């Protein structure tokens, strides 16, 4: 319950109703990507939720990054989404471990990139296939990124964090998706099923590491399935 100025208690709005309202008030995403979004949902491939799309779009518009790093490509929807809203000339490097998804993403970068279809231009997206923990270590520090989007295996976030911070430009933004794990992160580890306890513990460790990292200023948001927005201090 919350109170108003005259001391009366007001009921807390239902989270699901709030989510439906916000999504209803939000303009639709890029029309040329709606087909890919539906294909992914029907195939059970996880892609960024509408509220997370709004969050990313906001920071792309505000920060106008020249270089973006994505950890976790899946079938390429989020990379194409970011390309649509990023400034002209922005370069996106995206990393995917799963070979089948990486192959699907490469096909989608050709199929859904309007520049490529129209004039044979480069997509501005480079995909590196492999374990992100290893790939990140191979990227030189002088190849810094203005925005890093982390949306890969949730139990591995803690492994990716040191290199994600290292490669983030001062003043750059790190967006981490799915930190609430469908609300399970709120529960005690003893209330979580045994098979989910490891990822539960690792996600809590990741969130603590974000909040305690002296180079970052981090805000935790209930957006979508939870998102952390971290600013690298200058």
Give residue spans per PLM region.
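S-adenosylmethionine/decaboxylated-SAM
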Residues: 50-234
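Conserved SAM-binding loop and adjacent beta-strand
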Residues: 26-28, 41-54, 61
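A short, structure-level motif marking secondary-structure boundaries and short turns
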Residues: 20-22, 40-42, 121, 191-193
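Generic secondary-structure boundary/loop-capping signal
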Residues: 19, 44-45, 176
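A generic structural signal for short
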Residues: 7, 24-25, 44-45, 152, ...
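Short N-terminal amphipathic alpha-helix/helix-capping patch enriched in small hydrophobics
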Residues: 18, 32, 52-55
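N-terminal auxiliary segments of SAM/dcSAM-dependent transferases
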Residues: 1-30
